[in-house]
Regions:
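Central regulatory/effector-binding core of bacterial HTH transcription factors
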Residues: 1-50, 110, 118-119
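A ligand-binding cleft/hinge motif common to bilobed small-molecule-binding domains
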Residues: 43-52, 105, 122-151
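Flexible hinge/capping segments at coil-to-helix
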Residues: 52-64, 68-90
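Secondary-structure junction motif
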Residues: 88-109
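Short loop/turn segments at beta->alpha junctions
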Residues: 26, 81, 120-121, 139
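Short beta-strand->loop
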Residues: 54-65, 136, 140-141, 149-163
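Conserved small/polar residues in nucleotide/adenosyl-binding loops
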Residues: 166-171
Length: 177
């Protein structure tokens, strides 16, 4: 999001009357709005089905991991392995392609995971984690975990990275980023 914010700031400096409307959602929400002409472009996190769009990969990656309370036993580990998650109450993204990505990372025992809650926006899941509802499978740096936050993030091992993608209906718009 920081890359988009910087580009928006440069554009607004040159054209001060531009107004922005930000919409946050999962890939399903954003592609629906793109298809209906309600948004001009979208920033996606892989995996996402963008087969009907022109897109470019942004020059950054993010990593998957687990958001948890700092006072839980897993917080002492530097990384989280598949077997560490067995028997724990998990909050996971409700996106179908994300489920496929995690099942590939986890391996044969994916069906044994105790996914108690699904979410479409991590902010809401982070409140559930903060209140002791479980552990959220998520991307790093979306929820604040520094300072006085009771939460921490631990990356998955083996590492599960994702790329950020920018898509737009009009190829000319891609030059703005």
């Amino acid at each position: 999001m920081r890359l988009i914010a910087r580009a928006a700031h440069r554009l607004q400096s040159a054209y001060p009357h531009i107004a922005y409307h930000l919409f946050s959602g999962n890939a399903d929400d954003v592609t629906e709005r793109l298809d209906r002409g309600l948004v001009d472009f979208g920033v996606f996190i892989e995996p996402a089905d963008l087969s009907k769009y022109d897109f470019i990969k942004l020059p950054m990656t993010d990593i998957w991991g687990v958001l948890m309370r700092k006072d839980c036993p897993l917080a002492a580990r530097p990384t989280i392995r598949p077997q560490d998650l067995l028997g724990l109450p998990l909050l996971a993204s409700n996106q179908h392609l994300v489920k496929n990505e995690f099942s590939g990372w986890f391996g044969e025992g994916y069906e044994k995971l105790n996914i108690t809650t699904t979410y479409n926006l991590l902010y809401n899941a982070s409140i559930m984690v903060e209140e002791g509802m479980g552990y959220a499978l998520c991307l790093d740096k979306i929820v604040r975990t520094s300072g006085g936050s009771p939460l921490c993030f631990r990356p998955l091992e083996p590492k599960l990275e994702v790329c950020l993608l920018y898509t737009s209906d009009a190829a000319d718009d891609m030059q703005c980023v």
